[in-house]
């Protein structure tokens, strides 16, 4: 597991209050991890802060799974 992947998953666990074992790459924030729209906004904000980047709204809307978050952060680095 890459450092970025570990950091993204740690943020997801902290933000959504889910068990680390539930945070699989293919997991959907809403369908699998029980996030609502406010949770996803807070998650994007936490990712922006952790990785010192700005995620435009149109990109943030596409980040719906753990893997999508990892991929976005990797591409933004």
Swiss-Prot record:
MF term (GO), any: acyl binding
Main location: cytoplasm
Keyword Lipid metabolism: yes
Keywords: Cytoplasm, Fatty acid biosynthesis, Fatty acid metabolism, Lipid biosynthesis, Lipid metabolism, Phosphopantetheine, Phosphoprotein
Top-level lineage group: Bacteria
Residue numbers bearing the O-(pantetheine 4'-phosphoryl)serine modification: 37
GO cellular component, one term: cytosol
Pathway membership: Lipid metabolism; fatty acid biosynthesis
Subcellular location: Cytoplasm
InterPro entries per UniProt: ACP, ACP-like_sf, PP-bd_ACP, Ppantetheine_attach_site
Keyword Nucleotidyltransferase: no
GO biological process: lipid A biosynthetic process
Occurrences of domain Carrier (ranges): 2-77
Post-translational modification, as annotated: 4'-phosphopantetheine is transferred from CoA to a specific serine of apo-ACP by AcpS. This modification is essential for activity because fatty acids are bound in thioester linkage to the sulfhydryl of the prosthetic group.
HAMAP family linked to this entry: Acyl_carrier
Function: Carrier of the growing fatty acid chain in fatty acid biosynthesis.
PANTHER family attached to this UniProt entry: ACYL CARRIER PROTEIN, CARRIER DOMAIN-CONTAINING PROTEIN
Family: Belongs to the acyl carrier protein (ACP) family.
Protein name per the record: Acyl carrier protein
């Amino acid at each position: 597991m890459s450092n970025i992947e570990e950091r993204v998953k740690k943020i997801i666990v902290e933000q959504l209050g889910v068990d680390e074992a539930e945070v699989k790459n293919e997991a959907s924030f809403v369908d699998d991890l029980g996030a609502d729209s406010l949770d996803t906004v807070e998650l994007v904000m936490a990712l922006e802060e952790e990785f010192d980047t700005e995620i435009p709204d149109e990109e943030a809307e596409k980040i719906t799974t753990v893997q999508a978050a990892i991929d976005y952060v990797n591409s933004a680095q």
